[in-house]
A protein has these predicted regions:
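Polybasic "coupling" helices that flank or enter modular domains
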Residues: 97, 115-180
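Short alpha-helix-to-loop micro-motif enriched in aromatics/charged/Gly
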Residues: 61-68
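Glycine- and acidic-residue-biased ligand/ion/polar-headgroup-sensing regions
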Residues: 33, 44-57, 72-74
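Short phosphate-coordinating micro-motif centered on Lys-Gly-acidic
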Residues: 36-41
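Phosphate-/nucleic-acid-contacting segments
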Residues: 147, 156-219
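Cyclic-nucleotide recognition modules
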Residues: 69-125
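Cyclic nucleotide-binding regulatory module and flanking cytosolic helices
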Residues: 1-31, 71, 76, 81-85
Length: 219
């Protein structure tokens, strides 16, 4: 599929605006683990995922990571272009969780079109509101939801994303997603194993009882 099939307001642009984007559009292939955007040091531009998976996260003062949200096929990220929106000062890092093909609209190009096009401006505001809603939901989870429920939710989300109950993932990776410490996650997973919910092996977690994990995350 072409870029115009992925950009929701493409048909709302005039011919000159379409040409401006097409002439400046960057196509990029990134390997798993590549950092695409690194906080306010970068003004990468608007990212649109053609295929693959990206992770957007923040770093605490102590260097702990916590995942804000993930980006999948046809998802767009505006926080990588937050420099064009003066009211937003949000330092995020974006890295590829899988090999990813993406498009980048340079920040200044998008900023100019956003000023000219009401549909693009409206779409941008809606997308930003959605992302901040995701972040607020995450904050609520961290503040009010116990770690066992958050780990259960994460494992179930991973099985849905990967399409398998045999997850290739480390305890450190889970800790980074949840803003916790590896040792704490290890203790929790060992507890889950003792309860017959999962089976642990080096670099792998097998989900044995999804129904009980679902019950745990809802309790």
């Amino acid at each position: 599929m072409n870029f115009d099939n992925y950009f929701p307001v493409w048909n709302e642009l005039n011919t000159a605006q379409k040409k401006l984007i097409s002439d400046n559009l960057i196509t990029q292939h990134v390997k798993k683990g590549t950092v695409i955007h690194n906080g306010n040091l970068d003004c990468t531009g608007l990212l649109l995922v053609k295929s693959g998976q990206l992770r957007t996260y923040i770093l605490s003062d102590e260097g702990r990571e916590i995942t804000l949200y993930r980006l999948f096929d046809m998802d767009m990220c505006l926080l990588s272009a937050s420099c064009i929106m003066r009211s937003i000062q949000f330092e995020v890092t974006i890295e590829a969780e899988k090999d990813t093909d993406l498009w980048i609209i340079p920040a200044e190009i998008y900023k100019g079109i956003m000023k000219e096009s009401a549909p693009v401006a409206n779409y941008t505001n809606e997308l930003m509101a959605t992302r901040f809603s995701d972040v607020m939901w995450l904050i609520e989870q961290i503040m009010w939801k116990s770690l066992d429920k958050r780990v259960a939710s994460f494992l179930l989300e991973e099985t849905s994303i990967e399409g398998t109950n045999e997850l290739k993932i480390t305890h450190e990776t889970i800790a980074n997603h949840l803003g916790s410490h590896r040792e704490v996650i290890t203790r929790m997973l060992r507890y889950f194993q003792g309860e017959g919910l999962v089976r642990l092996s080096r670099g792998k977690i097998a989900i044995l009882d999804s129904k009980r994990l679902e019950t745990l995350q809802r309790s």
